[in-house]
């Protein structure tokens, strides 16, 4: 085995076990977004996750951890300007703890329509504006923005991860949970 890849919104759960993982190559993707409990009901608050991100980065190294700002949804409460402002604050906080930020925009799947009916696809113009500005902000803080590999089925390469109806965070934008009762 060359590498274990981790994707999480809550790295705190793994911190007590890091000594067991040190013999292995690792790469961590930690999703941190500024949404509140109305969108991400069971995700720890952003400040706590950023603190744990820093601890994890100190353990694995800046080149073995990436920040996911994902998904980007634009609506009346989460405007383009709001995302730019929040991203700037977050990038400043994470400066020196990662060199990579992966972004993606919300995908409107049927499960997303059911859980977040007000969600709309982000317009091409808003995607361009957000992408351009986030790239500039990230560069200012020593990070490179990369897009998520959306639309590519990479399962044949061992990249497809996760299982449906298993995540207890219950984010409104998530396509992986069809039935909340199955998760519980």
Q: Which stretches of residues belong to each language-model region?
A:
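N-terminal [4Fe-4S]-dependent radical SAM core
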Residues: 150-164, 184
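Electropositive, surface-exposed helix/loop patches at the edges of structured domains
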Residues: 108-110, 140, 163
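Conserved AdoMet/S-adenosylmethionine-binding subsite of the radical SAM
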Residues: 1-119, 123-126, 130-134
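A C-terminal junction/extension of Radical SAM enzymes
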Residues: 114, 125-154
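Local cysteine-cluster metal-coordination motifs and their immediate loop/turn environment
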Residues: 162-178
């Amino acid at each position: 085995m060359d590498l274990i890849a981790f994707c999480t919104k809550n790295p705190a759960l793994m911190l007590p076990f890091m000594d067991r993982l040190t013999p292995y190559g690792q790469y961590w993707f930690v999703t941190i977004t500024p949404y509140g409990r109305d969108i991400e009901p069971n995700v720890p608050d952003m400040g706590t996750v950023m603190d744990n991100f820093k601890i994890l980065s100190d353990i694995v190294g800046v080149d073995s951890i990436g920040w996911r700002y994902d998904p980007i949804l634009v609506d009346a409460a989460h405007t383009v300007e709001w995302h730019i402002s929040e991203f700037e604050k977050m990038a400043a906080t994470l400066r020196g703890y990662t060199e990579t930020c992966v972004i993606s925009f919300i995908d409107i799947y049927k499960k997303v329509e059911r859980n977040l009916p007000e969600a709309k696809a982000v317009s091409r113009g808003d995607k361009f504006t957000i992408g351009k500005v986030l790239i500039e902000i990230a560069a200012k803080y020593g990070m490179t923005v990369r897009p998520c590999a959306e639309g590519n089925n990479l399962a044949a390469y061992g990249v497809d991860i996760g299982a449906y109806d298993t995540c207890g965070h219950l984010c409104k934008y998530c396509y992986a949970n069809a039935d909340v009762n199955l998760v519980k």
